[in-house]
Amino acid sequence: MNVKKSLCSAFLLTIVLGTAAPALVSANETTTQATTVVAPEATTTSEATTGLPAETTQTIDALTSTTEVSTTVDATTESEPNTEDSETAALEKAGILEAIIGKDDQYRVKNTTVHPYRSVVYLQMTFGNQTYVGSGVMIAPNLVLTAGHNIYNRETGAWASSVIAIPGRNDNSSPFGTYSSSTYYTFRQFKTEGNVIPSNYDIAVVKLNKNVSSKVGYLPLAYAVSRGQRLQIPGFPAYTDSKFGKMYTAYGTVDGVNGHLIGHLIDAESGNSGSPILNSKNEIVGIHTAGNYTIRPYGNYNWGTRINSSVLGMISHSKKTNEGSLNIATNKETKTGKTYRLYNPGARRHLFTQNLDEAQVLTTRGWKFEGLSFTTVSKGAPVYRLYGKTMKEHLYTTSKAERDALVRRGDWNAEGIAFYSGGKKPVYRLYNPGLRIHLYSSDANEVKVLKTRGWKYEGITFYTQ
């Protein structure tokens, strides 16, 4: 395997995000390994330092019971003893882990075919001509939960073009096969909030092109997590050649927690982004996303995005449709002319947009999302959108002359083509001189009533389907 380690070639993804080696890809189902480009990622040790762990290869064969469970809706506690001493002793005695040396508290998982490790997924993602690696976990026969920045680059605004998933990868072995995906979901606010680290929304679902082997199973999700709780984080660190493609796990405790984030001091490094954060029942309580960041009042920790009702909502959404919504973005959402309306109660203004990213941002700024208003054609007469700096409202027109005249006045900004006019359903424009606002309606009866209440009818402004 040809492996290239480059800090710069990773789109600076690992510098900006702190913990996730670049990786995103789709490919035909096969058990062969792909050539990968790996970039370093920030590492935080149990002392919360940013230095690299001492280079030691430690090995862990997941702790197994005599009877293996192939699916894990009811996860067992077979892999994690109650105390740190018993954890290491039991794992070493079972031949699952190699001894810990130095500051690196990650253990090599030697047997990745046992519960819960067979459900931990090596991810390889492609952005353009670059390939990156990360981790994930099976949560359904065809769904992998991972970090949002593994599949969406906030610096470039690009989705991964493809993802390869290998459950239970063990060095050059793919015991359950190799799977591909080109459909992903994340929170829309992860796209629109900028490079916030750690992010409350840095979590994603990868939908595989087919179900994985029934032997893989998947892990359940859990809400409950508290400070001091014992956790483990299995995944695929890739900072050094000696660890690349091998599964490691590490144990530690929760040091800070809020409604969206889990702060911990468990060792993680490049490639661990997307690793599941597991409790003693092997339930997923979070996804590891960022390393060595400080958030007051919690402190300087590695961070993970916590499982909550919003995450469950995104997972449910991914099972039903490839389309996006106000809060959930997907790389497969189509621009089919759907036009959404928002209302600002303070300004008493309406706005129309076909951009759900814009709509989501506006809902954080006092606008109320009113849902789908109408559907426009893909080609036709352009409908221009302008913003009045004095009137603080948006205006829509198909007239270039009106657009240009308003721009020349100096208090209107042209914002480009909003959508296209076409179809048989007219949308009327009215103006209220007292309120100094425009209103758009496709309801002829509403227009008739408004004309008797001080609204000035300005005609048909465009047509919709």
Language-model features and meaning:
Residues 199-268, 272, 302, 310-315:
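Chymotrypsin/trypsin-fold serine protease catalytic domain
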Residues 90-118, 122-133, 139, 152, ...:
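Conserved catalytic-core segment of clan PA serine endopeptidases
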